[in-house]
């Protein structure tokens, strides 16, 4: 790069012509940093100096730590508050779906890292309602895909968006037709299918958005998976709604799902 002139650098693929005059100074700084730290790779941030200056100012003015303990948690809360869906419903759905993920770990066989992707998708699965209620799942997927969700790789953000979109009828073909389709393998799509199914089950268990079903107990034996529901009264609509996903469950996990409402004595 040092042996090129300005006109030659303007023709370098991937290098903005607006940066061709200052790129050498920037590269020199990065080169010194890598040499001083002994690092072998550099991960770039989507944020710039202006964001750093803002966070520094905000931290001092509001007396909050400048470094977040969980940057993904903070950024998804920002998105959730920005679009203001029914947060009680979103948080309840998240509680239910994480109970399934933990209780059926042997069944789905997924790494714990996917738990935070599922949690993010569940919290934000309804933000698309701000655009259109009837096709909100697709809009939620698009909004998650383009949101400032720090703490996720590009691939993880696509997976999170696909989970939120697929749980309510958006097929994987919608995502496979987009330019980022090459990010996801067939194995990724199988994972997304499992997580989208769990989110769909959780959504059906609060279909009336009243949190009537407050606790669930997922279980598994050799031939079936079980789901015991603890509710206030008889959640007839939710009990009916979950039936729509039983065939999807059997196709995905290869076992029947038995749903049982706990008796008053069990509660």
Q: What is each PLM-predicted segment?
A:
Residues 1-201, 205-209, 216, 220-227, ...:
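Helical "lid/coupling" subdomains associated with nucleotide-phosphate turnover
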Residues 233-237, 267:
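Short, surface-exposed beta-strand/loop "edge" segments at domain boundaries and coil↔beta transitions
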Residues 209-212, 252:
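Short solvent-exposed loop/turn micro-motifs enriched in small/polar/acidic residues
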Residues 253-267:
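A short amphipathic beta-strand at an alpha->beta junction
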Residues 122, 229-231, 261:
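Flexible glycine-/small-residue-rich
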Residues 237-257:
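Short, non-transmembrane amphipathic alpha-helical segments
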């Amino acid at each position: 790069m040092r042996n090129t002139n300005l006109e030659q650098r303007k023709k370098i693929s991937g290098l903005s012509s607006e940066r061709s005059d200052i790129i050498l100074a920037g590269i020199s700084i990065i080169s010194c940093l890598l040499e001083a730290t002994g690092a072998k790779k550099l991960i770039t941030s989507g944020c710039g100096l202006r964001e750093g200056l803002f966070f520094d100012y905000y931290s001092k003015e509001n007396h909050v730590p400048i470094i977040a303990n969980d940057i993904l948690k903070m950024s998804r809360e920002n998105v959730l508050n920005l679009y203001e869906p029914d947060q009680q419903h979103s948080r309840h759905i998240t509680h239910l779906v994480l109970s399934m993920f933990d209780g059926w770990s042997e069944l789905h066989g997924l790494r714990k890292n996917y738990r935070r992707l599922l949690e993010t998708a569940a919290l934000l699965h309804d933000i698309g309602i701000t655009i259109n209620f009837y096709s909100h799942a697709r809009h939620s997927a698009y909004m998650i895909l383009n949101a400032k969700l720090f703490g996720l790789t590009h691939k993880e953000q696509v997976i999170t968006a696909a989970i939120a979109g697929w749980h309510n009828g958006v097929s994987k073909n919608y995502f496979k037709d987009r330019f980022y389709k090459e990010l996801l393998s067939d194995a990724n799509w199988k994972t997304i299918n499992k997580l989208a199914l769990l989110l769909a089950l959780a959504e059906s268990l609060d279909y009336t958005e009243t949190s009537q079903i407050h606790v669930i107990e997922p279980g598994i034996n050799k031939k079936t998976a079980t789901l015991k529901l603890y509710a206030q009264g008889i959640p007839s609509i939710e009990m009916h709604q979950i039936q729509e996903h039983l065939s999807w469950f059997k196709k995905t996990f290869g076992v029947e799902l038995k749903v049982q409402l706990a008796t008053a004595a069990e509660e």
